[in-house]
Amino acid sequence: IDMIHMDESTLEFDMVGIDAAIANAFRRILLAEVPTMAVEKVFVYNNTSIVQDEILAHRLGLIPICADPRLFEYKSEEDECDEINTLQFRLKIKCSKSLQAARESSDPNELYINHKVYSKHMEWVPLGSQADNMNANFRPVHDDILIAQLRPGQEIDVLMHCVKGIGKDHAKFSPVATASYRLLPEITLLQPVEGEAAERLKKCFSSGVIEIEEIKGKKVARVANARLDTFSREIFRHDDLKNLVRLARVRDHYIFSVESTGILPPDVLVSEAIKVLMGKCQRFLEELKSIQKK
């Protein structure tokens, strides 16, 4: 595995020398089997907004929660909610008229107070000794997710329980926005391409794939960075150029792109996915051993 690029939410890395089945298994695990925390139950005490209770609950469930799932245990239907298996949030907000608004104003931002309900209004309510033991400030990943809009007198008062789950059970538990891979492009120039043809060849590929260099006073094309190519196949529209280039892919070189929802850093997601895959392999070997003993 070679790390290519990483920032707060995205990671690009290469996996070399593996089979397509392993690469796809790894992608599917990232999408559906790395656990996260998400809103599972919503207790509606008061909701006089235009948003129906079930729609409100659905919107709350899809808000990514910044909480490390490794700190929690899975909760079954029979288990009671406690500090080990549940995170609790409260959303209580009421819209009112602004007394400072100008009489001729028509801007809701000036006329009303709390007329837009955002994810930042969700407050963590610690259960048991969570505040002391976990040393964390659990919150929504993004503060600016719009949940509902209110008018004076309307109110939302709900209590939310977040539990640990995986994307296989519900998409709200998926820790990634996208997880994909592609084979490394392989571009070979079958013969020298010079002059005006070299310039046109460069325009047939993504920026940075083909570069022009001066050799003995002539412009000559060369492959600079094949991994930047998006396989647009533009080259095949040019009859005089298409036979000068061979396009292929390296069959055991996979370029992975992972974009986190922000719940966990992308490098942590990759390491957790590897652990899940190793656990699956170990369970399979144990099953084989048990069959052989029989």
Language-model features and meaning:
Residues 1-294:
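Protein-protein interaction/assembly regions in multi-subunit complexes
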